[in-house]
Design a protein with these regions (language model features):
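Acidic/His- and Gly-rich active-site-bordering loop/insert found
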Residues: 1-96, 117-122
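Glycine/serine-rich anion-binding loops at beta->alpha junctions
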Residues: 91-107
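Residues within alpha-helical segments
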Residues: 10, 54, 87, 105, ...
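Fold-level recognition of mixed alpha/beta catalytic cores in primary-metabolism enzymes, strongest
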Residues: 103, 107-110, 117-171
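Conserved acidic functional residues
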Residues: 16, 100, 133
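Short charge-dense sequence patches
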Residues: 3, 59-64, 97, 150-164
Length: 171
């Protein structure tokens, strides 16, 4: 199955996942990942949904970490568009979480989908650790999931965080 990064990003933006409310973002992501062969585990801590999805069982395990939650949009009347109804204008995706970081997640999922189609005999694992608790006080997200994974003897060898936090151009 081929996943469209733009369509997945739009679908994620349509989920008003304001911390800590998930609004279905984690389930949408899990559904897409399952369609390309990932085993998905939704891990709930208090009122926060988290996702650990893994493709493959061997090592090394390369993990992508990110979050689906967004900060509150404030007064919707101050927006020129509904922040949870994505639009593409001048080749730019506009909507709550487009930059931080729903489009990044969609691009990674699409890249993995393409990689899987071209590398059927890949020896190793690819995983995603996605939380719904990054924009808030972050007590029930990544830190707790990592502890949970350690208890389950799950090892992550390499990890990239797709968070767009550096304002400087690199490369």
């Amino acid at each position: 199955m081929q996943i469209s990064e733009l369509e997945l990003a739009k679908d994620l933006i349509r989920k008003p996942s304001v911390t800590p409310k998930d609004a279905g973002a984690i389930n949408l992501l899990a559904k897409n990942l399952r369609s390309i062969g990932f085993n998905c585990k939704i891990i709930n801590f208090k009122n926060v949904k988290n996702l650990y999805a893994k493709l493959g069982k061997s090592y090394p395990n390369f993990c992508y970490a990110g979050h689906t939650d967004v900060v509150p949009p404030g007064n919707i009347k101050n927006w020129t568009i509904n922040p949870f109804k994505p639009v593409v204008r001048n080749n730019k995706l506009i909507g709550r979480g487009a930059n931080d970081m729903k489009a990044s997640i969609a691009c990674f999922v699409t890249a993995v989908s393409r990689f899987r189609n071209q590398n059927k005999n890949f020896k190793g694992s690819i995983s995603l650790l996605i939380t719904g608790d990054e924009e808030g006080i972050a007590l029930n997200g990544t830190k707790r999931v990592v502890k949970y994974l350690k208890r389950k003897k799950e090892k992550i060898n390499f990890c990239i965080v797709g968070e767009p936090t550096n304002p400087n151009k690199l490369g």
